[in-house]
Amino acid sequence: MSDIALTVSVLALVAVVGLWIGNIKVRGVGFGIGGVLFGGIIVGHFVDQAGVTLSGDMLHFIQEFGLILFVYTIGIQVGPGFFASLRVSGLRLNLFAVLIVIMGGLVTAILHKIFAIPLPVVLGIFSGAVTNTPALGAGQQILRDLGTPVDLVDQMGMSYAMAYPFGICGILLTMWLMRLIFRVNVEAEAQKHESSLANGHSLIQTMNIRVENPNLNNMAIQDVPILNSDKIICSRLKRDDTLMVPSPGTIIQAGDLLHLVGQSTDLHNAQLVIGKEVDTSLSTRGTDLRVERVVVTNEKVLGKRIRDLHFKERYDVVISRLNRAGVELVASSDASLQFGDILNLVGRPASIDAVANVVGNAQQKLQQVQMLPVFIGIGLGVLLGSIPLFVPGFPVALKLGLAGGPLIMALILGRIGSIGKLYWFMPPSANLALRELGIVLFLAVVGLKSGGDFVDTLTQGEGLSWIGYGIFITAIPLITVGLLARIFAKMNYLTLCGMLAGSMTDPPALAFANNLHATSGAAALSYATVYPLVMFLRIITPQLLAVIFWGMG
């Protein structure tokens, strides 16, 4: 058997063993995709014992390409919501998550200085303790740039594997500890979260208002400032028994019922100006109007603003809401359409069908992957990651590397959505498949390289000490920030659990947090809010630590 065939066969065996290990769960918690690392260690141990030689160049390529696939697909997935998560609504959550990252770096620096832990080992412990695989890849690359011998770079994967198990368990123990210390009633926390959403800025809501302000009588909708803003959409108007789709030029009269869509604060402000909120239904049922959701798939409308498409003037149809990457938005006239956007249309059936034809509404296109943008994005990401950033006093130029470059480029492209006929939308199933493939390839190679010396290091070397260092790096930041967030910020427990899981970019921890309450989405929401920024910082942190420690040493 050729070296290439043998290498591929061994990698396939690693993936099978590792995924089987990952599926084993104890009390609902398992290693998940991280099991591939341990599958690689097991197979690597026996491969080393048997004296089998694998293709080093091929393993190196597969490891790096797997990492690129993984971080690129993550960036494409979270890109549309990344910049929104940095705004005020998620600022507090992101600040606490950043504090966890910074504290983890400080604890790592202190341990490195006090116990003189070798640089590759301490970076591996750091990456494993925070359960972040791209951090491992970024750390290994910067070590190679610094001229570290290959055998020492491979030690990083071994120390990563030592610290990884408690990284998984430590965050779950922290969630349990917070619940115990503060005697949390999970059901009550879920209800509080739902109440805060209803009163906050997080959800798009509707309100039916009767026009009672005499100053608005016989005024056009476009002449009423609160209705002519991009914060409120008036999607239906009922006069006597007639329900209609209003246009900017529609004259409103006292007694008209307006169906408004927007965020709760803006709706409340509109109600103060217009009149009184009423419970009267403005349903399209039994009328010649209907409400339908259509998806944007036509390349000709990508990047165009809603106002430039003139749907109201041409078809008598109003876009009441816009759903992008799972986030409900007010369909402001300045909003540009992106591939995969879901539009909530209100109008007559024939008119809605006409608008659906304009925007595409081809559901099958959502299941197709444009491969050209994928490779353009990966290529640009690798180029971005290769740009050297010279910092005075540092021995080598900093780079975003093969982990950071594709991630940043994917975040940007995911946010842009499309350029001409190229669109960076990727069906969730395809994104997940590429992401899982990438991380399996990466972890399989890391495990194989670490497996030869793993058992000896654990039983006869410093393996137990590495595990102890990892416990400190995992536990101190999580417990400290958890206490601060709960005591001083009065953070909701479910939100706190999601934030802690997101700060460790740890899907098993998110699964555990989601299972705390069957119906609440609090944990998933806070996880998604902090995940993009934390992932970026987790990739940059080991590079900064490596360069700083190298300069100090």
Curated annotation (Swiss-Prot):
GO terms for cellular component: plasma membrane. Belongs to the AAE transporter (TC 2.A.81) family. YidE subfamily. InterPro entries: AAE_transporter, RCK_C, RCK_C_sf, Transpt_YidE_put, YidE_YbjL. PROSITE patterns: RCK_C. Its main location: membrane. The keyword Cytoplasm does not apply. Keywords: Cell membrane, Membrane, Repeat, Transmembrane, Transmembrane helix, Transport. It comes from Salmonella typhimurium (strain LT2 / SGSC1412 / ATCC 700720). Residues 192-276, 279-361 form the RCK C-terminal domain. It is a multi-pass membrane protein. One of its GO terms (biological process) is potassium ion transport. GO terms for molecular function: monoatomic cation transmembrane transporter activity. It is found in: Cell membrane. This is Putative transport protein YidE. The chain crosses the membrane at residues 4-24, 28-48, 65-85, 95-115, 158-178, 371-391, 393-413, 437-457, 464-484, 493-513, 533-553.
